[in-house]
Amino acid sequence: MTDSHVPHPESPAVEEGEERPHRRIKSFVMRAGRMTEGQQRGLDQGLPLYGLSLTDTPVDFDQVFGRSAPRTLEIGFGMGHSLLEMAAAAPEHDFIGVEVHSPGVGALLNGVLTQGLTNVRVYDCDAIEVLNRCVADNSLDRLMLFFPDPWHKSRHHKRRIVQPEFAALVRSKLKVGGVFHMATDWGPYAEYMLEVMSVAPGYRNQAEDNQYVPRPAERPITKFERRGEKLGHGVWDLKFEKVD
């Protein structure tokens, strides 16, 4: 019979009377993926040029980009198609992408290199850490969260990234007038996002009916989304503006 009081070998021992360290529930699962030649090129050549690392103090992004410009941060950019298209279409804007999966990071950076873009920077780590440690308060014009994992099962809802605490964190990083733009293709998650954001302090829903906005022209349609539309699947966009 195993002694239930023996600490896990990978965990530090906790003395009697001590509190166990709080482990934040993560909204993502690391998945292994095979790298294409282009993705590997993006990592090898692009990451040293355009990759950013976690810091203990907020980053001066004006210095990073060499200018002061409207600034967008996207969490979980996947393979980078939307972020790449948006950055190419708006060279007067600066874009910061955050993604934990290496093939996606490599794909985005390969595109950045191929197109010669200079207005994109990338973090390949946990977005919550990036927001907490690297992004100054009141510094973002827009934060985008497109098609995050909906965590369908009820027991996994706590893993959804959109939570009251996350809404407050995003608000602290947005400028007044800045926008938190979300999109999902899972109806129940759209309702959940709307419920969380509608009661989050300091935001205004930009939808005229306080529900969902029509698909904004600036958000590119992905191949996945086009396929879903043909099958009759819906997509819901939410835009909440920081008002104070």
UniProtKB/Swiss-Prot annotation:
Q: Where does substrate bind?
A: K153, D185, T222, K223, F224, E225
Asked whether the UniProt record includes Membrane among its keywords, one would answer no
PROSITE patterns, alphabetized: SAM_MT_TRMB
Q: Which InterPro entries match?
A: SAM-dependent_MTases_sf (IPR029063), tRNA_(Gua-N-7)_MeTrfase_Trmb (IPR003358), tRNA_methyltr_TrmB_bact (IPR055361)
State where S-adenosyl-L-methionine binds: E74, E99, D126, D149
List the GO molecular function terms: tRNA (guanine(46)-N7)-methyltransferase activity
Keyword terms: Methyltransferase, S-adenosyl-L-methionine, Transferase, tRNA processing
Record's keyword annotation contains Methyltransferase: yes
CC per GO annotation: tRNA methyltransferase complex
Question: Where, by residue number, is the active site?
Answer: D149
State the pathway, as annotated in the record. Answer: tRNA modification; N(7)-methylguanine-tRNA biosynthesis
- Enzyme nomenclature, EC number: 2.1.1.33
Top enzyme class: transferase
Q: Where is this region: Disordered?
A: 1-24
On the tree of life, the source organism's domain of life is: Bacteria
Spell out the reaction equation it catalyses.
guanosine(46) in tRNA + S-adenosyl-L-methionine = N(7)-methylguanosine(46) in tRNA + S-adenosyl-L-homocysteine
A Pfam family that the UniProt record links to this protein: Methyltransf_4
What NCBIfam families would the database entry show? tRNA (guanosine(46)-N7)-methyltransferase TrmB (TIGR00091)
Membership in a protein family: Belongs to the class I-like SAM-binding methyltransferase superfamily. TrmB family.
Q: What is the annotated role of this protein in its UniProt record?
A: Catalyzes the formation of N(7)-methylguanine at position 46 (m7G46) in tRNA.
Name of the protein in question: tRNA (guanine-N(7)-)-methyltransferase
What species is given as this protein's source? Pseudomonas syringae pv. syringae (strain B728a)
Supply the source organism's classification.
Answer: Bacteria, Pseudomonadati, Pseudomonadota, Gammaproteobacteria, Pseudomonadales
